[in-house]
Amino acid sequence: MALKDKWQQDRIGRQQGVQERQQQVQTTLSLWQQERQNQALDDQESRQGFVTGVQQQTQELLTNISTERLWVAQQQREQLENFIQQLSQEVGEFLQQTIEERSQVAAQLHQQLSEFREDLEYRVTDLLANYQKQRLEARETLLEDLAIFRQTLYREVEEYLGELDILHQQMAAQLQQQLQQSRTERKDAVQKLFEDLGVFRAELQDYHLKLQQTVWGSSHRKPRKAITPQRSIPSRLYSC
């Protein structure tokens, strides 16, 4: 075989070897690209499944928190209504008892005044009878005794009326103090309830924000906090 033919044959063999290696490289690259595409699809499906699971768990957690918050609010509202009802009942019973005591005092006073008037009429009648009998004998002495009796009677009546006025003022002051104390205690209880609700709302918002940061990370835009207007305590709860 001539040298040229041999060189030509070797050249063709080298070209075929190069083509085979190029084909192998192309096949290997195609396989790698297909594997990378499949892996990317698998990773995308895994991420989508993870995000869907996290969203579902977050929604369930928020639903449970909302349900629990509504239940707690319902329980606290029932407790507050029971407290107000019990306090109103106690105040009504106290007022009824005070009215009955005042009625008893008035009845006793009326009876005492009636007895005093009867006794006074009797004493005046007896005094007038004695006065008519002893008029000529002891006019000056009788008039002096009558003046002393009148002064004593006036003083006793004034003292008795003063005692009644003091008793009435003491009862009114005691009733006012008890009503003021009940109103203050009820106000403190309602204020404490709303403060607890405010703390619970702040803790819930903080927990929700931390949960969003945990799920979405710090790269996502943080949601704006909902501004809840401060609720004022109804004045009707303080004025019973």
Swiss-Prot record:
Sequence repeats: 18-50, 51-83, 84-116, 117-149, 150-207
A GO biological process held by the record: gas vesicle organization
Chain positions covered by the region annotation Disordered: 1-20
Localization per Swiss-Prot or TrEMBL: Gas vesicle
One cellular component term from this protein's GO annotations in UniProt: gas vesicle
Protein purpose: Confers stability, involved in shaping gas vesicles, hollow, gas filled proteinaceous nanostructures. During planktonic growth they allow positioning of the organism at a favorable depth for light or nutrient acquisition.
Protein family: Belongs to the gas vesicle GvpC family.
This protein's name: Gas vesicle protein C
The species this protein was found in: Planktothrix agardhii
